[in-house]
Amino acid sequence: MASRFPKFSQGLAQDPTTRRIWFGIATAHHFESHDDITEERLYHKIFASHFGQLAIIFLWTSGNLFHVAWQGNFEAWVRDPLHVRPIAHAIWDPHFGQPAIEAFTRGGAPGPVNIAYSGVYQWWYTIGLRTNEDLYAGALFLLFLSVIFLIAGRLHLQPKWRPSVSWFKNAESRLNHHLSGLFGVSSLAWTGHLVHVAIPESRGVHVRWDNFLDVLPHPEGLEPLFTGQWNLYAQNPDSSSHLFGTSQGAGTAILTFLGGFHPQTQSLWLTDMAHHHLAIALVFSIAGHMYRTNFGIGHSMEDILEAHVPPGGLLGRGHKGLYNTINNSLHFQLGLALASLGVITSLVAQHMYSLPPYAFIAQDFTTQAALYTHHQYIAGFIMTGAFAHGAIFLIRDYNPEQNKDNVLARMLEQKEAIISHLSWVSLLLGFHTLGLYVHNDVMLAFGTPEKQILIEPIFAQWIQSAHGKTLYGFDILLSSTSGPSFDAGKSIWLPGWLNAINDNNNSLFSTIGPGDFLVHHAIALGLHTTTLILVKGALDARGSRLMPDKKDFGYSFPCDGPGRGGTCDISAWDAFYLAVFWMLNTIGWVTFYWHWKHITLWQGNVAQFNESSTYLMGWSRDYLWLNSSQLINGYNPFGMNSLSVWAWMFLFGHLVWATGFMFLISWRGYWQELIETLAWAHERTPLANLVRWRDKPVALSIVQARLVGLAHFSVGYIFTYAAFLIASTSGKFG
């Protein structure tokens, strides 16, 4: 007899209902719950899956390069980056006849194509790629890497090549290799690529494998490095009249500290970025030699943590016990990694538009909007995941004996104070912000806009001024034109920085007013409420006043029966589930704010944002309704146009989003009743009843249905806004 799915759980494989299928899929990667799992096998499976993950990433990036080289217009775009629309790939089968073919034949392509809003053209152009051959070479190399990683993953599952558990728990070696090897060496390699390939290419010098040993990246060669005259590498930078990709106005510097942006490309100076990566390489290479491994020198992580008892006794036993707690809990490690990665991803979103690193990307408005929104949503999911795994750690891996009176134990002891503080902050922010918005709405409705409560964000303006923004007239630090720091700034360090801050056409230190003040506090409300739900879920995961034995029920449980009353919706999983709605809501406000602020900046009518963003009807009417007109006109009685696909995606996104409520509102009793009726009808319908199944159909569990509902809500929500964002931006700016 063939073994039934799932092989990893014999108990589940013998389940006579459809629960076997759905629960089998849901727990396929939940290695901890599998029948034959040991600690060693768990580490090996995770290790192998990392190789698989890397293989998929390289295959995906290889596919991007390959399709652009094959079906794109990279070489035409390189000749005129500001006017040629970059093509992502061809559309094989354009439905809806001739109008569709005409609508989607763009960018000089022979047939229907998709336009790229990912910024890959600008990225590849900046790093020195110029021809389709370059793209094909990159695609082949990444494909090769992908295969190597797949083989490596398979290899490390073989008995001879399996690392031991002690290898996985060797924190010092891992830190050293990640700091020096991953960050240090890769940053150094990237500096090398920028200096040897990208910077020469930006000056019209073509460096490839056939000539890279003959072309000096700097006229002085390595002499300044060995004689200590490093300042020579910063002399003679590109001039403000430099035409990117040509020798006109080009300099010879390779490592500079200019600040600001290249006037033509509106992106950071390549020579500044090379300098930055070299500095990062140096710092991380040194950092990767700090921890004690083979030679008995350097720091021991455990010694540091054990010794770190804060003075005054206010934090108890400090970090005692933390080393073994973290090192033996994969969920704790994953929680820390996700928290870090989430913050970094959000920082990427903030920095990619304010300090654009890629040539001409700042003038590709739809790409700017798409990249910001994309990275913020990803950051949101990663950050909520951090708290989810933190809660799982507290339920499954936390040992109170091992952590007596250390900072972790004290967090749990003080959880009521933490949770109640987050609660009052959320209430204060929510009621005050909504109160101000609604007051302003009422004043507008009664025709007395002058009675609005408009608060200038003077503290934020003061901070902007201290960094050099002169508009507000604060005359402080770098905005004081007569001050010594201002004078030094022009000559000694970052001469282009102050110019960039005071250029009102970019997104660096955007001018802010009462509308920004209000939406800032609305976003703060969302952030604090999301944090409240997540922190409460994690801190109460082991037990609460209402349910002291909660940890015995695991991470996700629907209720503990009717007898105890009030135990529904209080598992740590439920907190994560609720927090995701708040996270999406918050990022909605963040992206609305970013997008509206920027489309008015790009269109040259910032007054619209400034005047309409101080009341809710302004947001609904002048942002959402006004900018959805492109979607509403995606197709009309006269046929379709190039925005039609976004109009359909907008509708489809709403459909997926609304489907989520079907799972969220009606619970399993309703579905079980419906299933029984449908099964009865099926068995009595000719022809249909020729199809039989072995598993008895049962409804999803409450927790499963919530997950399915949440997934539809999230996907639909993001699809809807993505279509709105891309259509409204590309409809205005092409």
Curated annotation (Swiss-Prot):
Pfam families membership: PsaA_PsaB (PF00223)
InterPro entries: PSI_PsaA/B, PSI_PsaA/B_CS, PSI_PsaA/B_sf, PSI_PsaB
Signal peptide per UniProt: none
One Gene Ontology term, aspect cellular component: chloroplast thylakoid membrane
EC number: 1.97.1.12
Transmembrane segments: 46-69, 135-158, 175-199, 273-291, 330-353, 369-395, 417-439, 517-535, 575-596, 643-665, 707-727
Location of this chain's protein in the cell: Plastid, Chloroplast thylakoid membrane
Keyword Transcription: no
Lipid metabolism listed as a keyword: no
Residues bound to phylloquinone: 671
GO biological process, one term: photosynthesis
Enzyme class: oxidoreductase
GO molecular function: 4 iron, 4 sulfur cluster binding; chlorophyll binding; electron transfer activity; magnesium ion binding; oxidoreductase activity
Main location as per UniProt: plastid
Top-level taxon of origin: Eukaryota
Residues where chlorophyll a B1 binds: 654
Assembly behavior: The PsaA/B heterodimer binds the P700 chlorophyll special pair and subsequent electron acceptors. PSI consists of a core antenna complex that captures photons, and an electron transfer chain that converts photonic excitation into a charge separation. The eukaryotic PSI reaction center is composed of at least 11 subunits.
Function: PsaA and PsaB bind P700, the primary electron donor of photosystem I (PSI), as well as the electron acceptors A0, A1 and FX. PSI is a plastocyanin-ferredoxin oxidoreductase, converting photonic excitation into a charge separation, which transfers an electron from the donor P700 chlorophyll pair to the spectroscopically characterized acceptors A0, A1, FX, FA and FB in turn. Oxidized P700 is reduced on the lumenal side of the thylakoid membrane by plastocyanin.
Protein family: Belongs to the PsaA/PsaB family.
Protein name per UniProt: Photosystem I P700 chlorophyll a apoprotein A2
